[in-house]
UniProtKB/Swiss-Prot annotation:
Stored InterPro entries: EF-hand-dom_pair (IPR011992), EF_Hand_1_Ca_BS (IPR018247), EF_hand_dom (IPR002048), Myosin_RLC (IPR050403)
Lineage, top ranks: Eukaryota, Metazoa, Chordata, Craniata, Vertebrata
Chain segments annotated as coiled-coil in the UniProt record: none
Protein name from the UniProt record: Myosin regulatory light chain 2, skeletal muscle isoform B
Assembly and binders: Myosin is a hexamer of 2 heavy chains and 4 light chains.
Organism whose genome encodes this protein: Danio rerio
Family matches, as PROSITE patterns: EF_HAND_1 (PS00018), EF_HAND_2 (PS50222)
Gene3D superfamilies: EF-hand (1.10.238.10)
Length: 170
């Protein structure tokens, strides 16, 4: 019975792929959680509607259909989890750790402002993956206070994560 289950699961994920060997199990789990957040209708495929919905939850209400189409067309077909993981694997090959983290934030910043809404980031960090505690959120906002519009500079956060100190103002 177990082999049948494994075969069905393999088919549901789009066949077997060595893409899973590119990542550690913990990384795969984190990508799965990100995929689940984006797959708003939970059908196992990321569509334009899923992207529109997740961007709307981040306050990006005026995303053009062409922009969504371009995002979806980066894949050769329907974006299931295996395709999603493969796309990330291709983008991250040989990437600098800071670039990897910035790229992850850029998914949440389609207008390329370099910022993300405080409320949205807090919701993600307290409800997904390794959930932040209230104390951890307090420390984050003390270290990286949002601007008056409630935006957080994620590039500075990425720099500190990878270099351990705050970047000098240019």
């Amino acid at each position: 019975m177990a082999p049948k289950k494994a075969k069905k699961r393999q088919q549901a994920e789009g066949g077997s792929s060595n893409v899973f060997s590119m990542f550690e199990q913990s990384q795969i789990q984190e990508y799965k959680e990100a995929f689940t957040i984006i797959d708003q209708n939970r059908d196992g495929i990321i569509s334009k509607d899923d992207l529109r919905d997740v961007l709307a939850t981040m306050g990006q209400l005026n995303v053009k259909n062409e922009e969504l189409e371009a995002m979806v067309k980066e894949a050769s077909g329907p974006i299931n989890f295996t395709v999603f993981l493969t796309m990330f694997g291709e983008k991250l090959k040989g990437a600098d750790p800071e670039d990897v983290i910035v790229s992850a934030f850029k998914v949440l910043d389609p207008e390329a402002t370099g910022t993300i809404k405080k409320e949205f980031l807090e919701e993600l960090l307290t409800t997904q993956c390794d959930r932040f505690t209230a104390e951890e959120m307090k420390n984050l906002w003390a270290a990286f206070p949002p601007d008056v519009a409630g935006n957080v500079d994620y590039k500075n956060i990425c720099y500190v994560i990878t270099h351990g100190e705050e970047k000098e103002e240019e």
